[in-house]
A protein has these predicted regions:
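Membrane-proximal helix-turn-helix segments that form the acceptor-binding/catalytic region
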Residues: 116-158
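Carbohydrate-associated surface elements
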Residues: 164, 184
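A charged, aromatic-enriched C-terminal amphipathic alpha-helix characteristic of glycosyltransferases
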Residues: 196, 323, 337-368
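Conserved donor-binding/catalytic core segment of Leloir-type glycosyltransferases
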Residues: 199-220, 230
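Aromatic "clamp/platform" in nucleotide-sugar-dependent glycosyltransferases that forms part
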Residues: 279
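Short hydrophobic beta-strand element within catalytic cores of glycosyltransferases
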Residues: 296-299
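Conserved acidic donor-binding segment of nucleotide-sugar-dependent glycosyltransferases
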Residues: 311, 315-337
């Protein structure tokens, strides 16, 4: 399994010997500096894995995940795969698409832009991730898409956790080219969640959670919506989880970025709801996790939120309705979002986002390769 985002060692590098730090820090820094002008990653390859791959006896699956945005050069990835397939034909290539990068000229998240459907003629924003100073997406999109067609020619099978990403990919590269396997909570997290018991109903003001890696980024956290919730004053208690919170007030509790999953889930378990306002996610795992422990999610309209919530019978809302719902108690929120009781919602969600279900789907996928 190959994920390129590894400029520094993560916890996985220490726990699992099979997890390899692929892109050197210097390479990532060079790509970050040049990307703003070139709109592509100039450096980074998988050549150091070539000998290991071809010397592995028997059939082998190379499963790619997120390789873009400062980590690996796309053309070099394709060249590597061509060399591997020529030397070891029993290698199977699989690529899970976690965003729209495969169909755009540059962006990983479209943020509502549909310019990729007409060749990314003029980017409406240079700040959309990954940000640039010069827009060259329209010059790069045809060559980039050819690289993905090269991967398809090599027999690469594409998967996405989200239907809207798969549909976008299939609209460009052909019907049925990308299959869907929804995200689910991993088995380690599921073990943590299984130990969390429903807490007694909160007798005080509603506790509302906001979770994001970087709370300053408006694409992930609607800044205006959060300030509107803060303006509700004593009607709610707002809890943020993430780095660089710009939110301060008498009704705001900033917990910071919590790396301990058990502590984060325990804290969320105390909440009446999680408010989700991201425009740039595709199948957000935090929603699966919150819903799995019986915390209702009040989400603004987005394809990602609609797809995740629909799996447990939920719906999304306009920002004005989010403000209204955030002032309600947990059972009322569950009824409004999911059309059922809190207990029924809990049971439904535990099944809908099960990591075991995701694992079984992947096992079935691998068995049919």
């Amino acid at each position: 399994m190959v994920m390129a985002k590894a400029e520094k060692k993560s916890v996985s590098h220490h726990r699992y010997p099979q997890v390899i730090k692929q892109t050197p820090r210097g390479t990532a820094i060079a790509n970050i500096a040049l990307f703003r002008f070139l709109n592509r990653d100039l450096f980074g390859n998988l050549d150091n894995l070539y000998r290991t791959v071809i010397q592995t006896s028997g059939p082998l699956v190379l499963h790619f995940h997120v390789l873009h945005s400062y980590w690996l050069n796309l053309a070099d990835i394709v060249t590597f795969c061509e060399k591997v397939k020529a030397q070891k034909p029993d290698v199977t290539l699989v690529w899970t698409l976690h965003d729209h990068w495969s169909v755009t000229g540059r962006c990983a998240f479209t943020d509502g832009c549909e310019g990729w459907k007409s060749g990314c003629q003029k980017c409406p924003t240079l700040s959309n991730y990954p940000p640039v100073r010069v827009d060259r997406a329209h010059q790069l999109i045809d060559g980039k898409r050819q690289r993905f067609r090269d991967m398809l020619r090599l027999g690469c099978q594409f998967i996405s956790p989200s239907q809207h990403v798969a549909e976008a990919f299939n609209s460009v590269y052909g019907a049925g080219r990308c299959q869907i396997i929804n995200n689910g909570i991993d088995l380690a997290t599921e073990a943590i969640l299984a130990q969390l018991s429903p807490v007694p109903l909160n007798p005080g003001k509603p506790r509302i959670a906001i979770v994001a890696h970087d709370l300053r980024y408006d694409g992930k956290t609607d800044q205006r919506l959060v300030h509107d919730m803060m303006a509700l004053g004593e009607k709610i208690e707002l809890h943020t989880f993430g780095k660089f919170s710009p939110f301060t007030g008498q009704n705001v509790v900033n917990h910071g970025f919590e790396t301990d999953k058990r502590k984060l889930m325990s804290a969320l378990n105390e909440m009446d709801a999680l408010v989700f306002s991201s425009r740039v996610d595709n199948y957000p795992l935090i929603l699966c996790e919150a819903l799995s422990i019986g915390v209702p999610v009040i989400a603004t309209h987005s394809e990602a939120a609609q797809e995740v919530l629909a799996k447990s019978g939920g719906q999304t809302f306009a920002a004005t309705d989010v403000l209204r719902l955030a002032q309600r108690r947990k059972p009322e929120i569950a009824q409004a979002v999911f059309g059922t009781t809190l207990d029924a919602f809990r049971m439904r969600s535990r099944v809908a986002y099960s990591g075991q279900q995701m694992l079984e789907e992947y096992v079935s996928f691998y068995q049919n390769l």
